Design a protein with these regions (language model features):
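AAA+ P-loop NTPase nucleotide-binding core of proteostasis motors
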Residues: 1-231
């Protein structure tokens, strides 16, 4: 339902920038992978068909920006390029844009640079942050926050988490060059829910599957044309 809500927000005329707010590990990034998968399959409204999702790394933009205006030029170059096509910019840990790039000379930070693009609607932005950082940082800049539509992301149930990791199955298989059986996906979710405390689904289940794939890369199964991850 969070993915459906995200798509619905993007289709709005105003405040069409979804902001995913939830505890670490509840699947905020997985939602973006799910959205990309639906766009790739064409299973989205016409407004989103053919759209390209880009992830924007604020740390890389800041790296090496030593002189006044360097960061602003870099960011505007990306935003101007993205506005020329049907783009969705994903900002993980979006709270970092507050104050990012602002030097002692009083130049504009990332949030101020983004405001005109948020207003114009030429680019759709999808942000993600935790409740703590949303309250601590995002709410301090009301001009940015009110241009986003907040979507509360809760920890999924076991059944929902199984669907999420199933959606990520192709990318995990492609990366590790292994195949994950359906039973392995289900076991990763149920076992992590039962035995791993202090963390949320689906993140802890994805970690188990990723670790299993890495193990088979280091310890390949001999005399098999393809390795299978089972429980």
């Amino acid at each position: 339902k969070e993915l459906d809500r995200t798509i619905q927000v993007i289709c709005r005329m105003e405040k069409n920038n979804p902001l995913h707010v939830g505890d670490p590990g509840v699947g905020k990034t997985a939602l973006i992978y799910g959205l990309a998968n639906l766009i790739n399959k064409g299973q989205v409204p016409d407004r989103l068909k053919g759209a390209t999702i880009y992830g924007m790394d604020m740390g890389q933009l800041l790296a090496g920006a030593q002189f006044r205006g360097d960061f602003e030029k870099r960011l505007k170059l990306i935003l101007d390029g993205a506005s020329k096509e049907k783009s969705i910019l994903y900002l993980d840990e979006i709270h970092n844009i507050i104050g990012a790039g602002r030097g002692s000379d009083g130049g504009p930070d990332a949030s101020n640079i983004l405001k005109p693009y948020l207003e114009s609607g030429a680019i759709c932005f999808v942000g993600a942050t935790t409740h703590e950082e949303y309250n601590r940082k995002m709410l301090k800049d009301g001009a940015v926050t009110r241009r986003f539509q907040t979507i509360d992301i809760k920890e999924p149930s076991v059944e929902e988490a199984i669907k999420i990791v199933t959606g990520l199955q192709p990318s995990l298989q492609k990366y590790h060059k292994v195949s994950y059986r359906k039973e392995a996906l289900e076991y990763a979710v149920t076992a992590s829910a039962k035995h791993i405390s202090g963390r949320c689904l689906p993140d802890k289940a994805i970690d188990l599957l990723d670790e299993a794939g890495a193990y088979l890369e280091v310890h390949p199964v001999e005399n098999r044309r393809r390795s299978w991850v089972t429980k």
